[in-house]
């Protein structure tokens, strides 16, 4: 543990030196042959909802962030995926209907999820050297089979709009010789993730259960369980190439949180985890995630003791906190630091662990 804290301090000092010399934050090329699971990036909580700081979603992407977050609702009347924080029947966000990169910073906002994903794809294609982007989707009210808004249709939807920029579960499973690991867990523990540099201009999508479905539905029907079962079924049928996203386990902690799922056959289909940053650091031993090459997303970076401002800490403090969480094994560090000077941390990509 002491060694990890020393490493965090060294990373923080390094970050300060970078800032002092006005050098850009680390990019994928600076990390040698590190895989996606061996780096830590910084992201923006509820990216779609920060219209005052980011008039358009592309403005947030322009910061060099490694993670954006979208909240989506299955609209029970229209059968469309809305993107908003609290409106289940309409979209309220900074996404536009873009067809080219020239459209990303103009036009009507408040579009549905398809347009948000289009914006991301178009931006990534216009920035092919940019480091990989994690797209975190909170599915507020989950899937809705009665409307056909199920994992199968969601796969097709995501693939249609992210296209060739998407890194999929099948990509993780596939070895260099073309053969495949039997499940995501085995592939992750073998560190079969692509090199971070090779994923420049690519997106990885994780989905998490939404606050609404957690409040009203039994855990057995949440999107994490439903999608893991979907992955298992696709693999058994030999059609895993159809899968588009990675289900994430909420509440990452020192002990494997997948044990909460009563069906142990689903466990190998979870390799992405989500945690509160304060709880993550407080657990004291989260190296298990790093050692097994699982991806981890930690939220509310400001809330680790000593707590920082949730919106505008000094750049020095923000960089030190990101370095601390990277040393503690976080893959993606989600923040609300969207104003200067703290937003200077958003483009940082550090060595993990």
Give the location of each predicted region.
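Secretory targeting and sorting signals
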Residues: 1-28
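Catalytic cores of phosphodiester-bond hydrolases, prominently lipid phosphodiesterases
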Residues: 29-353
